[in-house]
Amino acid sequence: MLKHIAVDFDISEKDVGNNFIKLFSNITNLIKFQISHKILILTIGLPKVDDEKIVEFLKFYVNKSFVDTNKVKISFVGKWYDLSSNLVSEIKRLLDISGNYNTGFLNFAINYDGHEEIVDACKLVVRKVINNKISIDAVNEAIIKENLYTSNFVPPDLIIKTGKNDGLNKTSVGKLNGFLLWDSKDSKIVFTNKSALEFDVERDINLF
């Protein structure tokens, strides 16, 4: 049974056009899939669109009623604190109202870069070595993992990457572009070769 699924909705605001309702409906269907199939952890790579669009999505689809009904803990991975004040406030609200739940875990990767995640983890480890909290010889993969944005979660069993693959027709070929870079080492990866607007949770997870 899959414990952790990660899906990266890789699409620009230009490519979304006027189809935000469709895009966010696809993301919502994925969240419903997590709940109905009792997937413990779901990580969603949010699209690079205007902050206010993300605020609208979170307020409408990931509201207090959803959180309380499903007892899901919401987390955000990435440098979300660098985003607009309105979005940061909404993120803090969700962190606050969901913090005591543990029936399921819903993570949103936003303003996230896999290389930066590893660099930031290394900086934290170096500081701990300098401050004599750990020895240099104690540094290993587990120590790096403990200092990642995703330190509290097991790596995904399955990663699904949306987006056209530069004209290639095979779903097995594509670019992960650093999504959950450290944690993707042993994950099964599916490239849908379809736009995020065409994402279908039942079909695309069945590719696995």
Describe each region flagged by the PLM.
Residues 1-208:
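Flexible, compositionally biased loop and terminal segments
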